[in-house]
C-alpha cells in the first residue's frame, strides 16, 4: 500500500499501487508531496472467540426468511449448531434471533473473517434482502462465549409487544431501504447517521445522463400510459452500468441520471456511459411495435473537479454531491445536445485518461457555457451524430396502436378514494406544527402526523362518542430527552393507565436504553388524538410513526390498559436491546430520505411495491439561488454546503407548511408540487421563501459572509404529471415527471429577466383566488411556450439581479483585499407588455403596490 502526504501532512490519501498514487498526484496538480510504501499485516486472526483480539469489527444485519413456516425453534437450533462449529474455527462470535419472518444477526470478528463469513451468509438461499444495520469497529467482544447463540422470539418472551414491534419496524425498514440514496446507505452500513456526518471533500468524475426528449414523450398524450415503463427501463439501465463500473448513482431527476466515479475510474466511467447508449440501442431493436421504449436515446456530459459529499436538509434530506463542478457538468451535458453528440467531456476529464483512450478521442472545440466566464474545451468519441430534432420528430409521429405496457398509468381522479395513493399532504392550512429546539429550530416532521392532525380536527372534542370507532393500531418510536429513572417511568404509567382506560385504549410501552417504543390500540379517533398529545410531550423527541393500520381484534387484552416493558423483561436475552435500539435509530435516519408518498403509504400498512402509477394535475414549484455559480466559484466547499443547507431547510419548511410535497433537492435547486386546487398555498410558500432570503441578507449585511448575498427566484406552473416508482435492480425511485417539470424551470429562469421574484404562468393564475388573481399579479413581457406569465405584485417581491451580482462581486473583492470594480449604473429597462390574450375587464384592474413603479397594467 502507498501513502501520499501533502500540505505539510494535512492531507493524506492511500493507494493500492504506485501508479495510482502518481496519477492522482499529477491530476490534482500537487507539487510538494511525499510518497511512502507501507506494508500492512493484521494484528490477529482466527482468535477463536478470545476477547484479546484488537482489530475487531461488529456487524448487525436484518434479512427476511424465504420459508417462514419452517423456522421453528428446532430449525433455528440446527442452524446455530452448524454455525457454531464453523465460527469456532474462524474466531467469530455473535447471536442469531428470529421473529417471523425476519432474521436478526450480529457477528463479531476480524475484518478478514467477517468479510468471508458475511459473503457466505448473503448467498444463503434460506433468506433474502440482507440489509446491514450496523458495521463498524469495536473495542471488545460482547458475545465472546457465543460462537452462535440462537433464539426464537417465542423462546425469549411470550409478551406480544416485542414480536409485534420488531415485525413492524423491520418491515418498514426493509421496504424503505431500496429508496435510500446509496451514499446514505453506505453510511448506515458503517453504523453512522448520515445526517450527523460532516461534509467530505473529494475529487470526482461527474456525469449527467439525459433521456433524450423525455419531455416530448410526456407531452404526447398517446404515450402518457407508457411513461412509467420508460422511466423504469432508464433507471435499470443506468444502475446496472454505473454501479457495475465502480460508480455511484447520486440521484435521478425526471429523465436525468446524475452519477459520479472516483478519479481512478475515469476510463470505466466513459465506457459505462457508452454502454448505456448501446444497451438502449439494443432495447430499441427488440421492442414490439407501439412500445415507447423504442424511442429511448441517451446523451451525457462529463466533467472532473472538486465536490463535497454531504447531507443537505433536515426535515427532508438528500445525501449528495455539491460543488461548482456539478453546475459545469450540467452545462456540458446541455452543450452535447447542441453539438449532436451522445457523449461530451471536458479537458479536465481528458487529462485523466490513459494514452490508449486518448488516441480514440477527438476535439470538439471551445465553447462558452452559462455561468462560466471562460470557455470550456470539450472532447468526444468519433461516431454517428445524435440529432435531437430527429428524435423529437419520431416521438411526435409515434402511435402506440394496440400496444399495452406492463405499467399502465391511470388517472388519479378516476380511482376510488380508498385506492388513491397518498400523493398529497392533507394538513389543513394554517395548522400549527410541533416544534422543539434543534437545528434550525425545527423538529423533523413525522411522516403521518399531517394526516393524523387532519383526522383529529375533523373528529372534534367528543371523538369517543361520535367519531370514527374503527379498531386501529398505531406504533411509534421516539428518543428520551433525558435519562429516565424508575420514578419517571412510574409517573408515565400512572397517568397513561388512568387516561387510556377512559378512552378504551390498550397497548404497550417499551423503554430500552433511552428509546421509547409504544403501541396504541383502540377507536381510531381516540388513538389519533392521544398520539397527537403524546407528540407534544417534552420528555421525548424525534417522534416517528412506524405503523398504523386497522385491526380485526386487539393484540393486548382490555385488562392490560398499558403494559410497561423495561430492561428487566429483556434480561433473559440482552442482545435484544441492541437489535431494537439499532433498528429504531436506523429507521429514524432513513425516513427523512424516502419520498413522503412512499412513507405514508408504507406506514398505513401497505406494501410500497403496490403503489399504482397515476397521472394528475398539479401546481409545480421550482426555485434556486440567483447567481449561484458566481457566488460559489470563490467560496470554500464548506461555504457552498452551508449556503445550500440553509436554503434547502428554508424551502422544505415553507413548502411543507403550506401543504406541498418536496420532489427533489438538486444542489441549490428545489422542486415541489401542490394540489391543482391549491395554487394560493403555492404562492404563499414562494412568498415565505423569498422573504426568508431577504431577511437572511439583512442579518449579514455588515458581515463578509456569503449568506449576505443569497436571493432566489421562484417559478410556478400547472400541468399534468405522472407519479410512479421506477427501478428493480436494488435502487427504486419514486418519480414525479411531466412536461410541466421542465417548463417550470424555464418559468423560474425568467424571474431574472422580468424583475419579479415570483413568476406564475396563466394556468396557475386561473387557479388563484379572485382576490389574488385580480389584485396581486402583474403581466410580464415574457411567455413560455405561448403561455403568458405574471409576476407577483409588490415592491417586496421585486428582484434586482444586477444589484445581487454587484453585491457578490463586492463580497469577493472585500474578502480578497481587492478594490471592487465600479460599473456605471445602467438605466432600468422599461418593461412593456407584449401583445397577447387580453381578458375582459383586465384594463380596469391595477395593483396599488405596482402603480407608479412600472407603467404596466395589473391583471
From Swiss-Prot:
Subcellular location, record wording: Cell projection, Cilium, Flagellum
EC number: 4.6.1.1
Catalytic activity: ATP = 3',5'-cyclic AMP + diphosphate
PROSITE patterns: BLUF, GUANYLATE_CYCLASE_2
Bias (Basic and acidic residues) ranges: 815-831
CC annotations in GO: motile cilium
SMART domains, per the entry: BLUF
Region called Disordered, residue ranges: 420-443, 813-859
Pfam family, one: BLUF
The Guanylate cyclase domain, residue ranges: 205-333, 619-748
Function description: Acts as a blue light photoreceptor for the step-up photophobic response. Mediates photoavoidance.
Record-given protein name: Photoactivated adenylate cyclase subunit beta
Source organism per UniProt: Euglena gracilis
